[in-house]
Curated annotation (Swiss-Prot):
It catalyses: a plastoquinone + NADH + (n+1) H(+)(in) = a plastoquinol + NAD(+) + n H(+)(out); a plastoquinone + NADPH + (n+1) H(+)(in) = a plastoquinol + NADP(+) + n H(+)(out). Residues 173-201 are annotated as: Disordered. Its cofactor is [4Fe-4S] cluster. The gene is ndhK. PROSITE patterns: COMPLEX1_20K (PS01150). This is NAD(P)H-quinone oxidoreductase subunit K, chloroplastic.
């Protein structure tokens, strides 16, 4: 028996034994096994899909795209989130097993983007719905930026404690600017109280005597008929 056959015999014990904690071991095992959920609502998802190709090859980071939320532990909200899509997004997040992580990808996801000023159906920030771990700005972000966000998430996972993460999600939430619209009861379905908008009355709302009175005259707007 020589040292060539058994090279570990000449090594010191401190180089052969690893001392760690259960939390560190759990975090280390999750670093290279982040399985993202294939979720996209806008053009940002095209940039994320390009990572699957051989040019960027995100398989080297251990990322395996999954089509089921029950098999995924990472979701990248790529694209605009609307009021009608919000309940489905929350349901997908709730179906993901713990521990789970969220990356807000793109300006439309983070603040509403170009739709944040005059859109009545866009969520101004996905952090109103989900606890976000990493914010990735851009319109849209490049694939290199997505890889950088995943790298930062891996660093965050390596030093986190699972119990503290669950506690922070229940107490601490970060919100963006509130909506400037009056939200009705069914806000998750995109129905807003739009009573302040001017709406011309229909012909059925005009009394018959008023309608026939102005029928022979020149064209009159519906507002004039009511008044």
């Amino acid at each position: 028996m020589t040292s060539i056959d058994f090279p570990l015999l000449n090594r010191r014990t401190q180089n052969s034994v690893i001392s760690t904690t259960p939390n560190e071991l759990s975090n280390w095992s999750r670093l290279s096994s982040l399985w993202p959920l294939l979720y996209g609502t806008s053009c940002c998802f095209i940039e994320f899909a390009s990572l699957i190709g051989s040019r960027f090859d995100f398989d080297r980071y251990g990322l395996v795209p999954r089509s089921s939320p029950r098999q995924a532990d990472l979701i990248l909200t790529a694209g605009t989130v609307t009021m009608k899509m919000a309940p489905s997004l929350v349901r997908l997040y709730e179906q993901m097993p713990e521990p789970k992580y969220v990356i807000a990808m793109g300006a439309c996801t983070i603040t509403g983007g170009m739709f944040s000023t005059d859109s009545y159906s866009t969520v101004r920030g996905v952090d109103k719905l989900l606890p976000v771990d990493v914010y990735l700005p851009g319109c849209p972000p490049k694939p290199e930026a997505v890889i950088d966000a995943i790298t930062k998430l891996r660093k965050k996972i390596s030093r986190e404690i699972y119990a503290d993460r669950i506690r922070s999600h229940r107490t601490n939430r970060s919100f963006t600017t509130n909506h400037k619209f009056q939200v009705g009861r069914s806000s998750h379905t995109g129905n807003y109280d739009q009573g302040f908008l001017s709406k011309p009355p229909s012909i059925s709302e005009i009394p018959p005597e008023t309608f026939f009175k102005y029928k022979s005259q020149s064209s009159v707007s519906s507002h004039a008929l009511v008044n």
